[in-house]
């Protein structure tokens, strides 16, 4: 409801100090994917967007691969659990696809998650596009990314790039898995992106990679992370609140 600047500003007018939109936002001060561009948050930002759960999964995949291999162009498909934007039985919806029963069909539909990558990694503007297939599962989704790299590579190199990223600079938002897991195994996992090393395919410079994500719980964790970061950026008598949120964050990740 409050996903554009005009409507989100109503919260500020009512006395709120900051607004974090839990969805892609329009004309916001910044779109932040925690772990990727949260260092840009400042006290001047009053209305920010946490992007989408899918963008939060895709960005930690794309960043290290682009830095090491160069991403020339790519297409993403998210195999996405159904959400409350869909109908449980066939009924009216502005999107004819989403008017169909979420529990009875696989439903192709649109997503802006791939294009939104440019808002957090500007050099990728125009290089990525994508679509979604909504499936009749309650939770946990999968990003399937195919891209043309700037040079030839191998399965081993791609997996090593992702493993290193998950162990170092992206350790808070990216996990690496080389076990034969399925969607239910990632339920209630707090990471934005869980890279599935067993699904990596390479043909010269053509690369396919996949990552799982709990599209509810993982995204909620990033909302909390960005809230803490925004509080720290403002530094207006918030150390007690920030410390309490940090403690809550630690408890959540241990669940």
What are these model-derived regions, one by one?
Residues 49, 104-105, 211:
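A short N-terminal beta->alpha junction/helix N-cap motif
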Residues 56, 153, 217-218:
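A generic structural signal for alpha-helix starts
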Residues 190-255:
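NAD(P)-dependent Rossmann-like dehydrogenase/reductase catalytic/cofactor-binding core
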Residues 70-73, 78-207:
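C-terminal substrate-binding/catalytic lobe of Rossmann-fold NAD(P)-dependent oxidoreductases
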Residues 63, 119, 163, 225-228:
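Generic alpha-helical structural context detector
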Residues 1-99, 201, 223-225, 234-237:
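N-terminal Rossmann-like NAD(P) cofactor-binding subdomain of oxidoreductases
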């Amino acid at each position: 409801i409050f996903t554009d600047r005009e409507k989100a500003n109503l919260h500020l007018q009512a006395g709120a100090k900051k607004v974090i939109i839990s969805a892609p936002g329009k004309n916001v001060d910044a779109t932040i994917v925690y772990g990727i561009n949260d260092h840009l948050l400042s006290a001047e930002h009053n209305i920010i967007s946490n992007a989408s759960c899918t963008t939060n999964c895709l960005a930690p995949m794309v960043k290290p691969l682009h830095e090491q291999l160069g991403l020339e162009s790519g297409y993403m498909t998210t195999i996405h659990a159904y959400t409350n934007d869909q109908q449980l039985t066939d009924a009216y919806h502005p999107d004819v696809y989403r008017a169909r029963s979420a529990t009875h069909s696989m439903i192709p539909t649109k997503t802006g998650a791939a294009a939104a990558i440019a808002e957090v990694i500007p050099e990728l503007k125009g290089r990525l596009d994508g679509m979604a297939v909504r499936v009749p599962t309650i939770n946990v989704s999968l990003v399937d990314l195919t891209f043309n790299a700037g040079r030839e590579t191998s399965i081993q190199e791609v997996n090593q790039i992702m493993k290193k990223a998950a162990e170092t600079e992206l350790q808070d938002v990216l996990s690496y898995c080389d076990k034969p897991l399925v969607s239910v195994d990632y339920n209630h996992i707090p990471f934005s992106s869980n890279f599935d090393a067993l699904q990596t395919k390479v043909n010269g410079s053509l690369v396919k990679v996949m990552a799982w994500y709990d599209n509810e719980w993982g995204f909620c964790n990033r909302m909390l992370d960005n809230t803490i970061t925004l509080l720290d950026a403002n530094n207006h008598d918030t150390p007690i609140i920030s410390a309490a949120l940090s403690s809550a964050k630690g408890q959540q990740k241990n669940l």
